[in-house]
Swiss-Prot record:
Name the record gives this protein: Deubiquitinase and deneddylase Dub1
Transmembrane segments: 40-60
Family, similarity comment: Belongs to the peptidase C48 family.
Organism per entry: Chlamydia trachomatis serovar E (strain Sweden2)
Top-level EC class as recorded in UniProt: hydrolase
One Pfam family from the record: Peptidase_C48
Residue stretches of biased makeup (Polar residues): 1-11
Length: 418
């Protein structure tokens, strides 16, 4: 069988390739690779250098913020700071420096001294000389507020008036001494010798605001018993016999009831206890004498308070006495059915500038009433308190002289019954 190819057209045989020989690379691709590597390395280097410069700049800025960064001292030992105060009276001060150049002179300012900032001398290679800083100027003392600064301002005229009032009070106290129950009872005994219709009621113990009504009613009941010839039911006085007391009750037409008052106690027992305590101490304290006159003949209740409203207001006292007057109308009725009336004697404070003349004022008012019960002698009192008490002092001296011969705590003899 014949081959399809022509036998005459023969091709040259291809020699076999040797597998051991290396395949050669062209030089152009190799140069391009080297250029890429070089460019990459250059870019990386530029980036590193840029970052390094940035870090170096920020590091230098941080170092510059420290206080020791810009100082040129070679030594690590910190130089002491010298503060030089510049007071007014002192001469100009020179700041000493360890260096050879002369120190600059700090001239004194024309304005008042102010706190001087600390001056740091420049450092030198040599060791600085130790120096002691001068003492700081004393601080201005803080204003101290005294008790006078805290008190309100009082005008001088007020002190003058207070001094005059104090001097006036001392003068009045020297003119009129305090009267106790013994002097008052002696004064009543003396008044009985002048006016037979007055009964000298004992003032030991005296009546109080809590029992004066019961005492008045008891005396009027005993008077009715004497007029009827019956025995008395009330208690007898300490220093008076029953016969003498009955004679006094028979002829009396006026009952002077002295009341002892103190604002602290609120009951009768507490009042008597306070009275004993003050008597032991020998002090009057805040006690006060009051007077209630029971005028049987004129059918009238007269209330006198030299302090005007020490116990209660005059309006309240008048209402209370009006109620008591109605009770007396039933206890001791009049033959002509006349009713008891009430009168508040004092219209103002009588004992101005005095705290212990109340007993003497009660006796003075009683003496005025005995002389003329229908004339108000209080309207004629002097306005000046010193002059008023000078007149009272004259009455006191006359009474004290009159009672010197009277026996102690002894009732005067009343007239015999008819």
């Amino acid at each position: 069988m014949l081959s399809p190819t022509n036998s005459t057209s023969k091709t040259a045989p291809v020699p076999p390739q040797d597998s051991s020989k290396p395949v050669l690379i062209s030089e152009e691709p190799q140069n391009q690779l080297l250029q890429k590597v070089a460019r990459t390395a250059l870019v990386v280097l530029l980036v590193v250098v840029t970052l390094g410069l940035i870090l170096l700049f920020y590091s230098f800025s941080d170092l510059q913020s420290f206080p020791w960064c810009c100082q040129t001292r070679p030594s690590t030992k910190e130089q002491p700071t010298i503060s030089i105060p510049v007071p007014l009276p002192s001469p100009p001060l020179a700041v000493p420096r360890p260096s050879t150049p002369p120190p600059p002179v700090i001239s004194r300012p024309s304005m008042p001294p102010a706190p001087t900032p600390a001056i740091s001398p420049p450092s030198t290679p040599s060791a600085p000389k130790p120096s002691t800083p001068p003492p700081l100027p004393p601080k201005a003392p803080k204003p101290v507020k005294t008790q006078e600064d805290l008190l309100p301002f009082v005008p001088e005229q007020v002190f003058v008036e207070m001094y005059e009032d104090m001097a006036r009070r001392r003068t009045i106290e020297a003119l009129v001494p305090a009267w106790d129950s013994d002097i008052i009872f002696k004064c009543l005994c003396y008044f009985h010798t002048l006016y037979q219709g007055l009964i000298p009621l004992e003032t030991f113990p005296p009546a109080t605001i809590f029992n004066f009504k019961q005492k008045i009613i008891s005396i009027l009941e005993d008077k009715k018993a004497v007029l009827r010839g019956e025995p008395i039911k009330g208690s007898l006085p300490i220093c008076c016999s029953e016969e003498n007391y009955r004679r006094h009750l028979h002829g009396t037409t006026l009952l002077p009831v002295f009341m002892w008052y103190h604002p602290t106690p609120k009951t009768l027992s507490d009042t008597m206890q306070t009275m004993k305590q003050l008597a032991i101490k020998g002090s009057v304290g805040a006690s006060h004498w009051l007077l209630v006159i029971v005028d049987i003949q004129a059918r009238r209740l007269v209330y006198f308070d030299s302090l005007y409203n020490y116990v209660m207001s005059p309006e309240d006292m008048e209402k209370d006495l009006q109620s008591f007057a109605q009770q007396l109308d039933q206890v001791y009725p009049a033959y002509d059915s006349q009713k008891f009336s009430v009168k508040i004697a004092a219209k103002e404070v009588i004992q101005k500038g005095s705290g212990s003349s109340c007993g003497a004022w009660c006796c003075q008012f009683l003496h005025w009433y005995l002389r003329d019960p229908f004339t108000d002698a209080l309207n004629d009192l002097p306005v000046d308190s010193v002059e008023r008490h000078e007149n009272l002092a004259s009455f006191v001296q006359a009474c004290e002289a009159a009672v010197q011969d009277l026996p102690e705590l002894f009732w005067p003899e009343a007239k015999a019954l008819f």
